[in-house]
Amino acid sequence: MSLIISLIESAQGHYPLVLLMVFLLTFTKSCALVSLAIPGTSGLLLLGTFASASLGHFLLMWSSASLGAIGGFWLSWWLGVRYRHRLTQLRWLTAERLARSRLFFQRRGLWAVFFSRFLSPLRATLPLVSGASGLPLRSFQLANVTSGLLWPFLLLSPGALSLSLW
């Protein structure tokens, strides 16, 4: 435990870099282009420990993570709008994965966008599918922003609370 505490204390001196790391992690984890290759959930749980110093640190980290998550989903939605006719030509997007995402979106609509943030296989594809399906930006952003605020909060909180209670 002392090793973890010393790592956290040394990172506190480079807090802007930690915030940038959190932003990039959540952005890439929420972006259709690279989401499948980035292990973001465990990284956010670990990075939450850096926010244990104070409420201010937690709020900054949560803001940074939320901006990254919201931006990554928005970019994915835009790519779906822009390249909707070419989604089946993407090598990393299998026909089965695309079909599952479309089915989930058709069944659940806007809720599918919200819940896909919390379901790793859908997080990579559902914003893309929702954009390709013609979901209006305003509706998409409603689900995007609410889930983009909640998801990082739920992942950062355990780490922040664990060391503050220790």
Stretch-by-stretch model annotation:
Residues G40, N144-T146:
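Central hydrophobic cores of alpha-helical transmembrane segments
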